[in-house]
């Protein structure tokens, strides 16, 4: 069964072909990053128009890569939401029109579910059940995943998502758009503990997270540096140090909350998905993760247990059509009914969890 996947929720146009017998056959992606850089952020109208221009050429490119034709497509999956309304509508219109013309089913996919399942595209795949950390510009959530369609939301950010905090902090530091990736790059040259920022909610008993206060702490540090130097410019090394301290704080919070989720569920496998999943520091920290079951005072400590951690291939951390094609194929196999034309710019993840 060959499924065409279409992703158009924000500023990447992704098209891919996934074969339920042979795996991923083709994957094409166009990013609008350069177009939006001039404006310092995504312009929804420009994003929508660019999706319209790119969808047909990308589809034909995928078919050529796979040595397939339109007639070989068995189903069309598309991102129904959440995302930018106009951008979603561009993908939905194309997917539904193509499916109608081919007389094939169309499968709506929740964008976050696509990210959630993207590590299953890797050669080394996790087994169910696992704890999933969805960490991107729009969402930071921890979930218990027991199978396709069997998800339980355990905790999430109560304010800014981690990726959003990266981007806003980068803008505060005067870094060019898109700033999150640049901040991570500069953090590599930062000195450890030159700055120390708070780890919001790291010791709370629940799995909720908060990053807006961390952003405020960075602003306070930046204003202090500028006042001491009597200039708006921040010395290069100081800026790098701030980037490192910020990144370390975010990763520490994410790691602490995921460890708590592992202890709560009893799972020993973690899947990290979403754009921030490409962050080197996060991958390094999670790659060395262990958990230790708490013991009563005076009792011998339990030995640390190694955790198996899985990341999607770097190409599938950001928005892409491959994850949508795969998620659509999985739902088609499990009997999900074909969907409708409508899009859902605001689609709470709670509506797809059990």
Curated annotation (Swiss-Prot):
Keyword Isomerase in annotation: no
PANTHER family: TRNA N6-ADENOSINE THREONYLCARBAMOYLTRANSFERASE, TRNA N6-ADENOSINE THREONYLCARBAMOYLTRANSFERASE, MITOCHONDRIAL
Pfam families on file: TsaD
Name of this protein: tRNA N6-adenosine threonylcarbamoyltransferase
Keywords: Acyltransferase, Cytoplasm, Iron, Metal-binding, Transferase, tRNA processing
Function comment: Required for the formation of a threonylcarbamoyl group on adenosine at position 37 (t(6)A37) in tRNAs that read codons beginning with adenine. Is involved in the transfer of the threonylcarbamoyl moiety of threonylcarbamoyl-AMP (TC-AMP) to the N6 group of A37, together with TsaE and TsaB. TsaD likely plays a direct catalytic role in this reaction.
Required cofactor names: Fe(2+)
Keyword tRNA processing belongs to the record: yes
Binding site for Fe cation: 111, 115, 319
Gene source species: Neisseria meningitidis serogroup C / serotype 2a (strain ATCC 700532 / DSM 15464 / FAM18)
Domain of life: Bacteria
Positions annotated to bind substrate: 134-138, 167, 180, 279
SUPFAM superfamilies: Actin-like ATPase domain
CDD domains, per the entry: ASKHA_NBD_TsaD_bac (cd24133)
Similarity annotation: Belongs to the KAE1 / TsaD family.
């Amino acid at each position: 069964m060959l499924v065409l996947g279409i992703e158009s929720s924000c500023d990447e146009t992704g098209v891919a072909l996934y074969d339920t017998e042979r795996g991923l056959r083709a994957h094409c992606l166009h990013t609008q990053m350069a177009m939006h850089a001039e404006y310092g952020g995504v312009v929804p109208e420009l994003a929508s128009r660019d999706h319209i221009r790119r969808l047909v050429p990308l589809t034909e490119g995928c078919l050529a890569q796979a040595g397939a034709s339109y007639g070989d497509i068995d189903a069309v999956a598309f991102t129904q939401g959440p995302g930018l309304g106009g951008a979603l509508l561009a993908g939905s219109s194309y997917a539904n029109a193509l499916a109608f013309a081919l007389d094939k089913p169309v499968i709506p996919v929740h964008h976050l579910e696509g990210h959630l399942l993207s590590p299953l595209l890797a050669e080394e795949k996790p087994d169910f059940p696992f704890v999933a950390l969805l960490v991107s510009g729009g969402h930071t959530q921890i979930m218990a995943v027991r199978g396709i369609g069997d998800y339980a939301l355990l905790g999430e950010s109560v304010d800014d998502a981690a990726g959003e905090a990266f981007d806003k902090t980068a803008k505060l530091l005067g870094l060019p758009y898109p700033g999150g990736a640049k901040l991570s790059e500069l953090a590599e040259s930062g000195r450890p503990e030159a700055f120390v920022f708070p780890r919001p909610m790291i010791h709370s008993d629940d799995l909720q997270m908060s990053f807006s206060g961390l952003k405020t702490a960075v602003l306070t540090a930046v204003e202090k540096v500028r006042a001491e130097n009597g200039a708006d410019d921040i010395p290069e090394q100081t800026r790098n140090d701030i980037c490192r301290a910020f990144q370390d704080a975010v990763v520490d919070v994410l790691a602490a909350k995921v460890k708590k989720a592992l202890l709560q569920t009893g799972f020993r496998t973690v899947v990290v998905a979403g754009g921030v999943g490409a962050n080197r520091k996060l991958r390094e920290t999670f790659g060395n993760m262990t958990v230790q079951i708490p013991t009563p005072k005076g009792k011998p400590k339990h030995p640390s247990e190694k955790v198996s951690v899985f990341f999607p291939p770097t190409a599938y951390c950001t928005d892409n059509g491959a994850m949508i094609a795969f998620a659509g194929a999985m739902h088609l196999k499990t009997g999900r009914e074909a969907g409708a034309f409508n899009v859902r710019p605001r689609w709470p993840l709670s509506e797809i969890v059990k």
